[in-house]
């Protein structure tokens, strides 16, 4: 990584794992897309190429990624629905060349060496942390650095630097009246199916007691 598509119009950086990438790959191959490796990154990249931002509705996994869409001159980034993989961002009015920009990464320390990153303590983030002993807000201890919430995506218009953040998934907590035994059977089925989906790997899978 970074990985680009065939004409170089899309470039992706990706951290995580897409559990259903093989199904996505088969669907995309049927549409004429060519694959050059067995990585889930390529399925994600071509998925965006085909479905745009709606690719998020098809993903199953843990992920944080950003795609540079050169044709639309924008960035598109997203985080998985449970927030397993982190994604931090730092909007800049001046990225050093007089134009706006944004830093992004899975760790804040990747920002530290950038010459136009302003290192300052965010005092507003200290109070909730001292109270709850974990960071409960989108703000971080660095002023101006934020974490993208779970189940959210952002777009950045590169010429203007305008950033838009949207939620793409939410849980439905509506109660459904069913016999207790039916709930047990459904839960058992979901757990087994989830474990099976997580077993996809390039090496043998083991479990530690």
What are the functions of these language-model segments?
Residues 1-209:
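Cysteine-centered catalytic environments shared across enzyme families
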């Amino acid at each position: 990584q970074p990985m680009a598509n065939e004409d170089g119009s899309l470039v992706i950086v990706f951290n995580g794992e897409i559990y259903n990438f093989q199904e996505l790959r088969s669907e995309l191959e049927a549409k004429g897309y060519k694959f050059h490796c067995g990585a889930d990154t390529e399925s994600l990249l071509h998925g965006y190429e085909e479905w745009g931002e709606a690719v998020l509705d098809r993903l199953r996994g843990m992920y944080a990624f950003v795609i540079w869409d050169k044709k639309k001159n924008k960035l598109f980034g997203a985080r998985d629905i449970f927030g397993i993989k982190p994604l931090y961002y730092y909007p800049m009015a001046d990225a050093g060349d007089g134009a706006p920009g944004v830093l992004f990464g899975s760790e804040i320390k990747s920002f530290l060496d950038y010459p136009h990153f302003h290192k300052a303590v965010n005092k507003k983030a200290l109070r909730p942390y001292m109270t709850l002993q974990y960071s409960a807000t989108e703000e971080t201890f660095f002023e101006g650095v934020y974490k993208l919430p779970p189940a959210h995506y952002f777009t950045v218009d590169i010429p203007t630097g305008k950033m838009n953040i949207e939620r793409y998934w939410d849980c439905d907590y509506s109660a459904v009246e069913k016999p207790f035994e039916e709930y047990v059977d459904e839960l058992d089925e979901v757990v087994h199916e989830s474990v099976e989906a997580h077993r996809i790997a390039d090496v043998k899978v083991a479990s530690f007691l």
